[in-house]
Amino acid sequence: MGKVGAGGGSQARLSALLAGAGLLILCAPGVCGGGSCCPSPHPSSAPRSASTPRGFSHQGRPGRAPATPLPLVVRPLFSVAPGDRALSLERARGTGASMAVAARSGRRRRSGADQEKAERGEGASRSPRGVLRDGGQQEPGTRERDPDKATRFRMEELRLTSTTFALTGDSAHNQAMVHWSGHNSSVILILTKLYDYNLGSITESSLWRSTDYGTTYEKLNDKVGLKTILSYLYVCPTNKRKIMLLTDPEIESSLLISSDEGATYQKYRLNFYIQSLLFHPKQEDWILAYSQDQKLYSSAEFGRRWQLIQEGVVPNRFYWSVMGSNKEPDLVHLEARTVDGHSHYLTCRMQNCTEANRNQPFPGYIDPDSLIVQDHYVFVQLTSGGRPHYYVSYRRNAFAQMKLPKYALPKDMHVISTDENQVFAAVQEWNQNDTYNLYISDTRGVYFTLALENVQSSRGPEGNIMIDLYEVAGIKGMFLANKKIDNQVKTFITYNKGRDWRLLQAPDTDLRGDPVHCLLPYCSLHLHLKVSENPYTSGIIASKDTAPSIIVASGNIGSELSDTDISMFVSSDAGNTWRQIFEEEHSVLYLDQGGVLVAMKHTSLPIRHLWLSFDEGRSWSKYSFTSIPLFVDGVLGEPGEETLIMTVFGHFSHRSEWQLVKVDYKSIFDRRCAEEDYRPWQLHSQGEACIMGAKRIYKKRKSERKCMQGKYAGAMESEPCVCTEADFDCDYGYERHSNGQCLPAFWFNPSSLSKDCSLGQSYLNSTGYRKVVSNNCTDGVREQYTAKPQKCPGKAPRGLRIVTADGKLTAEQGHNVTLMVQLEEGDVQRTLIQVDFGDGIAVSYVNLSSMEDGIKHVYQNVGIFRVTVQVDNSLGSDSAVLYLHVTCPLEHVHLSLPFVTTKNKEVNATAVLWPSQVGTLTYVWWYGNNTEPLITLEGSISFRFTSEGMNTITVQVSAGNAILQDTKTIAVYEEFRSLRLSFSPNLDDYNPDIPEWRRDIGRVIKKSLVEATGVPGQHILVAVLPGLPTTAELFVLPYQDPAGENKRSTDDLEQISELLIHTLNQNSVHFELKPGVRVLVHAAHLTAAPLVDLTPTHSGSAMLMLLSVVFVGLAVFVIYKFKRRVALPSPPSPSTQPGDSSLRLQRARHATPPSTPKRGSAGAQYAI
């Protein structure tokens, strides 16, 4: 499993990001390779992207501390493309901190003409297309048409209050990290560095500090040491006054710590080299440090002293405890690697992580790089049998396997979010390559239902998976996603967490006011939701919690998403309607809690203007922020709520120092807003006011008022709605059909949900619906659609299985093996369980409260042991057998065996292995009721069954320390009929060609035949054959009751066969695979099994009867030899491989027209 990302933006260029508050990082391209500018982000600070090719990925959570100075963003706020410099700014979730990455040294040298034009300021003041508006402003996004108007524009332009400060002496530095404390603080810290690409290290650094919001700066190199080279700047997320500086490990390994916002520092030596840090989300002095040699350290004194926790820790797989789920705030979750390369999940206290005090919450090994601890959930992955299996623990309870629809068969899974006690996951299924399906879970994170199919994905430069999904800030349950439909990518929106999706309505008019002829569903608005090619760069889509109705994004109008003809669009009513605001890409900042939008154009030329909108993007005014055009490297927005200050970072030329332009927006407001300056606005979806079960009314500033908002007040009022069907999604195992009903999927048995129930207890009997998590509706149909508690029925034991805890059939001599007794139905608490371990030891259990812990046993000798379990209660009994090898792994074994054969006929069983060459093998065969197995060195063996009925054959294959098994059931009768079935071609599109799918489809076909013909199910056996196209074999069996009486005659079989053929020829047999997918079942041709078999074991009377039939048949053949040609199937050659779907062993006795049943001898019908 790879890492997943979701966000917004264009991949056409590396972009800069302007965000709210916090930390800005400016660095040259290629620096990530050195690790000094772009360290690996820790998962707890990485929302939806990372680079590891395996294991779960996840999104960060509010309140999580950044592990490194690069916490990935929750939602991008502002982007700027500074030409050939790469820059991104991202905000750490829940900390109020923001970050950016930029490049300076990679700037190309412009031609002389370009340089001259840049230094004259041409291009920087070039206005967009359109007509000039009041005050000399132009319509945004359009170019000048009248030179006189352009001149008048420059003369009458509006100016913002700004000051410029140059970081003198740092002109060679190509990286910068900026921290703005905010929260009533005027302090800004800047760390600039010179990264030498040839040496791959930092050779110079400078530390600057401002105490007046960036008007002036003081150089602090003498306070940290003139020869000290600094590599990183860290800020405590819970106390912004605490600063930590990390020295370059190439020179020395030290920390410089400040508790007064960087005014003074204390230096501490380290005996290890820090690769990343993870701050505690609550305790400001608690830190985890990950070293370059994969050791994890902890400090309870903000880095002044360190203690080793664990060696061999997997990178980025360590986490702090989560309040509300863990009792101990100092508990550490980590994934550690053993000497032999396995991984396991450990927990321990930060200051007491000895061998005796470590816990292992998940028994056994997990897949490397798969541990995720996020909110109330813990996720791990375990691959067995070539398939990944995913496990979740909710609120630190026992792990349960995550349940996707049965035939999702995931290749890859990524945890996108765990907000509001629900898991949102992206799953790549067995038949997907560049798309993922979105699934949403119940509260425990166990049962998942489909939210959206075929969401577009792409792979980042470091191998991380990026999902085209964007969560809109400020509105619970609102997402945008790009879905692939017939090779076209279209943007969809949901307001109820994926229950319903719709296309985006395009604007009615363009920038010039001309009508846009775009009709749904053939034409719509499509938005770019990908992040930039730079893994630390956010994309060009923006929303903000404090402005819940405003969304700004780049995209296009048409039939599909395009990378050309990109414009900028804004919605001020939460995605219901959209307006075009620019014809070229811009980046937008939310100022004054979204009361003002600031836009800056993407251009490789120097600029000195930006655009402001005071009416949610309806109109824009042009302002200059500097008198000299500036190559913009990045922008840092206001960290506080009312400062209205923005800092622009850039250069006047490629030879100049860093220029810091402080822009103060307070002068554009004449007063603070009063109550009469606001109006109510109701959230809705195309007129529907009930969103997620509630009506929400927000307070918005009137568009004509130009006052400063200050603090955000949130929703004015919220009231719950009456529950309707729209507030409920289909429950696990159910699918929504065209009539809107949720009906069971073909593979799902609703009664299976009560199998773990004990008499006297109760379980939730699903109605097929479940309420959307976080939906606040009340009354209405809530009672009708909610699952009902139901008393557990008393049942006899059924479906008993005994397995080892790790699912293997081997155990080490002298070590504990845990046996799990699993009962599909039956009352565990009133059951007697008897276990015979096969080594002379047996135990009994009565009235067990739970079997979750399993039964432990130690085998003292090596060998194969027959473990038998007998379960009895007052209603019945059941038994199960496990053949346990006490010592061996093999990838896969499959038993090839006929579905049906004739009595006293030799049957060939073959073990098919994967991989086929695994060295010396031992085959252990169990069949019938034999208590002793047959052991061979060959993969094939012959059996003979002397009595009619169902028989079971089990093969176990041993190779070294690996043992795998497969079990098949074969029907044995003196006589039967068989018919080849075919299907409408659409079934092949959904055929993953695995045994489980074939068994379930066979069951569905049998059910359809029984319903269409009324033939009892005991007479019908359907076997779906492997391979494509999909085919099946229908067997008509002479069922008899358990007493051996009332056995069907040959004539009865003929009549049943004719009825089945007639029904199939009438196209009356069909089934619905999924909503909208109807599969028709056809008849191919029929063969028949003999009344007697041509073998010496039969009596003399039978031989006389056979000879008579032969003579009659010969006479008929002579008479009709020129009128009718009879084709007799031949037995296959010995080289025919079992598993070939066309293989059938048969000897025909009578020939009849294809439309009627043929009698003959069918020795065996083979399929895998």
Swiss-Prot record:
BNR repeat positions: 208-219, 256-267, 492-503, 569-580, 611-622
Cytoplasmic side stretches: 1121-1168
Coiled coil: none
Biased composition (Basic and acidic residues): 111-123, 141-150
Biased composition (Low complexity): 38-53
Post-translational modification remark: O-glycosylated.
Sorted UniProt keywords: Glycoprotein, Membrane, Repeat, Signal, Transmembrane, Transmembrane helix
Name of this chain's protein: VPS10 domain-containing receptor SorCS1
Species in which this protein is naturally found: Homo sapiens
Lineage, top ranks: Eukaryota, Metazoa, Chordata, Craniata, Vertebrata
